[in-house]
């Protein structure tokens, strides 16, 4: 069974900050990358094209916004939770997930196996949070590891405690 790891990049006050080389390394080591529509558009526009060509990318979306018809991008529409359960059950490997919408989908449906939080030592302010969702699966999350990485960033890995 595949493991789904949600990556969250946040400021000290919980606001979103851009992903960095930690995400790139996780994406390189994974079976595929899972993102939401907003993250897909942001990545595409920031790079003036699609930079994630080595891996299949799954984009959870309400419709088709395909700007990358020649790349390895697949759009997950309809019942995304059911499709992700099917993908998770098929084979081995890690799915690297990123984006607030993706995080909400995974956590609200009990699909995330691990959460990797990179906390950047800045205060951003504002109402938007890096992860805005309710944890509806009723499971407890425990810290599996925590360490200071370069530039004072803190990498914390949380894992589910299975009932």
Enumerate the predicted regions with their spans.
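Enzymes that bind and transform nitrogen-containing heteroaromatic metabolites
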Residues: 1-163
């Amino acid at each position: 069974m595949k493991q789904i790891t949600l990556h969250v990049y946040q400021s000290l006050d919980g606001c979103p900050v851009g992903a960095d080389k930690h995400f790139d390394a996780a994406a390189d080591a994974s079976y595929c990358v899972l993102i939401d529509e907003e993250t897909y558009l942001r990545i595409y526009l920031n790079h003036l094209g699609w930079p994630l060509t080595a891996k299949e990318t799954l984009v959870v979306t309400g419709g088709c916004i395909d700007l990358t018809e020649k790349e390895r991008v697949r759009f997950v529409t309809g019942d995304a939770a059911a499709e992700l359960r099917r993908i998770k059950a098929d084979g081995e490997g890690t799915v690297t997930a990123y984006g607030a919408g993706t995080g909400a989908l995974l956590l609200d449906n009990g699909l995330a196996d691990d959460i990797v939080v990179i906390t950047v030592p800045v205060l951003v302010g504002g109402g938007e949070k890096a992860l805005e969702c309710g944890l509806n699966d009723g499971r407890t999350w425990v810290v599996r590891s925590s360490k200071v990485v370069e530039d004072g960033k803190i990498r914390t890995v949380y894992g589910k405690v299975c009932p």
